Amino acid sequence: MKNKNDSNEQISLPKEQVDILMGLYSSDKINEAIDMIKALNDDYPNVPLLFNLLGACYNKLGQFDPAAQFFETAISIKPDYAEAFLNHGIVMREVGKLDHAAKSFKRAVEILPSYVEAHNKLGVTFIDLNKLEDGIEHLEW
């Protein structure tokens, strides 16, 4: 019998746990959320949502390097995770890496063409990069 930690298989996280986590995050109980996510990660390895939430927590704490790493982990587990690409782009903007931010936002839009927030952030980032036509295209889409 295989140990669940030896597998790349994703195990579903119970909705009740997700609701509790979202409540902690929304209430700015970030350290509690981080502790809960780390505990859940032991029982539910390779769940991209947990890594995305860890990244969001560290971003909220202003710890951008670990935030970016957690978003990248979420993306490596689920390469079509538009929200993780959006969040990665947000962190890249925070640290002034506009080219990296644009790539992440663009990937989010490629995955989910109707993703309004990703289009807006991509448009603003293109404008900041003096790519005005590209920026306007995403702001007016």
Name each model-derived stretch:
Residues 2-16:
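TPR-adjacent "capping" and linker segments in tetratricopeptide-repeat scaffold/adaptor proteins
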Residues 15-43, 56:
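Alpha-helical segment of the N-proximal tetratricopeptide repeat
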Residues 24, 51-58, 70, 84-95, ...:
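TPR/Sel1-like alpha-solenoid repeat signature
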Residues 40, 73-74, 107-108, 141:
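Canonical positions in the second alpha-helix
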